[in-house]
Every structure is written in structure tokens, then in C-alpha cells.
Amino acid sequence: LATTKPTPLFPTYAELTELSLSDYPQLSAYLENQPKWMQQHWHWAKDYLLYIGRNKSEHTYVRFRNDIEKFLLWVFMVDKQPVDDLRKADILRYIDFCVAPPVRWISTQLHDRFNLSNGYFASNLNWTPFRQTPPKYDKDRVLDPKKYKPSLQTLESTFVALSSFYRHLIDEEICFGNPIPLAKRDCKHMIKDSQVKTISRLTEHQWQYLLDTAVELADTDALFERNLFIISTMKTLFLRLSELSERLDWSPVMSHFWTDEDNNWWFKVYGKGKKIRDITVPQSYLSYLKRYREWRGLSSLPSKGEQTVLVEKIRGRGGLTSRQISRLVQQVFDAAFDKMKSEKGLEAAQKLNEATTHYLRHTGASMEIERDRPLKDLSEDLGHSSSATTDTVYVQVERKRRASSGKDRKVE
């Protein structure tokens, strides 16, 4: 029944690669109590997620795991039809379910799926498939699961994951068709978005304020040297959060900073789509790199082959995860917001309250556009597939032309 509390089905990718159901007593008992076809479905989904984990990024695995898990729980507990029997109308009913899931399926906090207890992975009773989060600019908002409503982007992501799952089942000759594209075409919840896109960025003044705050924090407390290094690096080198973080198949190290025969500095990055690229490093950035390395007791600049972790944990070994880096960035955003609010008022500071880590990449790229850097060079630093992508996201020539042509029309 939809009112029954659902149980988690899949752990992290690292745990899934070594999964033995004997180590997951509640999950094992749950599956054993299901019909054979449901147990088979779980194994289909497990094989698919292992494929995603091997061939895609950790972020993609997490995103697809979340969507496939929700879908299977709906199949097991609500619809009770095998996935290879589902048609367009069934998928549309599932999307209706995702738009208004039962309250028992929604939580307002992030919970781990499984907790290690006495050598076993116990299913977390607090975990739910859906999570309601407050907007970043209103973190104190009291949430009501009855008012849960997924964003258009969330629904889009659901369709992408389900379509990928069905394509995998077709490749494995389990299914003979993919009902997802037809369902998406006819879904009443999918609204075509042709709105004018704005860039989520800081102004030059806001960026300088954020950087000055990070410097002040680091001058006062040396532990904030990491925060300063992270925000200056993400903005100046246009990095995505994942590109600075420790991943299963990549660990950023100091020797990823390197020089060519002309003494130009570069930074090697493992980016989106499992592509490695080199980013130009400006001279102005080197003082921040030197400051950070000096704090860590290293030589002023990296040497060839240096395997020192780029952003290391204070306790423990290895580099920081995306979530840990995000927390360090957020500390600086919060401090800058509080400072600007007290000095210039809430309205002036609001953008710093709304900003996320990705604002740093967008801010750096937008400021490069403003200084007339060649689009092709910037596009390669950003890791875009073409200059057209960079133009669409940052330059927005068509939007500016349209705004200009419509600006002088008359009312009378």
C-alpha cells in the first residue's frame, strides 16, 4: 500500500559493488517476502546501477539510483505490475504519484539509507524516497510534507533516468520497448520552458566582498585557509564542485598544477562526461596557491609528480567529498552575507544568501566574458563541447538583441 513506509533498496556505489544480501538483513527479508518477479526486478536494477556506477560519475549514480529506487518501490508497493508490462498510461500514473506522493514517503531531512550496526547494514527507518528541502535563501522555513511539489527539473531528471533504465533493459533483451518518451510527450506536468534564462552569478562587487571576507577569516583563523583556497580556485579556474572533490576514479593532487615549456601554468581536471582537460592558470592566482601551500608546510609551488592531496581532510586521510567542500564554501557565503547585511542592509546582501557553489564557476566565466576574452579559449577552459554552448549560457547574444529590439516600442 502507498501508505506503508517504504524501505531503501540500494546503498552507495562502493557498497553496491561488494553487496551481499546476508549483510543487509532487513533488505534481504523484504525481498524474500516479495514475489519472484519483484526479486528479479531488484537484480535487474542492481545490474543497471552497477553499470551506471562503472561508466558514469558518482553524482550520476546517486541521481539515477534515487530515481530507479523510487520507481521500483512504486512498482512493488503501489502498482504491482512488472516493469516490462508497463505502458505509457502506467508511466503517466507513476509521474502523477511523484507529483503528489503519500506523506509517509516524504521527509524534510536527509537520512542515510543504511546504518552499520553490529557488523550489518540496517535499513534506516527514517529514510524516505522523497525529500522536501527549503530554499537556500529561507533555510528556517517550516516545511509541510503535504505541500511537497517537485520542480520541473526534478521531473525532467526522472524521465531521463527511467528512459536510460528501459534502454538498458532493451539492450539486455528483457524489454522490447521504451514507454518513457511517449509518456513524457503526453505528460501534463511537463511544461515547455522558453523563459529568458539568467545567469546565477555574483556581481564583481559581491565577488570582491566574498573574497575579502574569506581573506579576513583566514587571517583570523588559519583553518579558514582551506576555505579561501577553495573559493578562489573554483571561481578563477571555473571549477564544478565535483572537479575539486575526491572521487572513486580521480583524486585531485598538487601535480595537477603543471607548467609548459613557456612557463605557463595549467591545471588538469577530470570533468563532466569523464573528460580530462587542462585549464589556464592566471598569474594573479599563484599568490593564493602559494599562500595555501605555505600554510600546509609545502614548497611555494607544486613540483612535477607531487602526489600531495589538493584539498585534504583535517582529520583522516584523502581528499574532501563534494558535500564537505560545499560546506566550506557555505561557511564563507554565510559570513559574507552576515557582514554585508550589517553594513549595507538585507536587500544588498540577499544574493549572497541565495548563492550556491556553482555561482563561483558562473561568476568567473561571466567576468571573463566582460573582459572580452576570446570565446573559444574560455569555452575550452570551461570544458564546453563548443563555443556555441558558452555563448548560449553566458553571452546570450540573441537575448540581448531581442531586448534591444523591443525596448523602444510605444504604448500609444
Regions found by a protein language model. Name each.
Residues 271-291, 306-332, 354:
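C-terminal catalytic core of Y-nucleophile DNA break-rejoin enzymes
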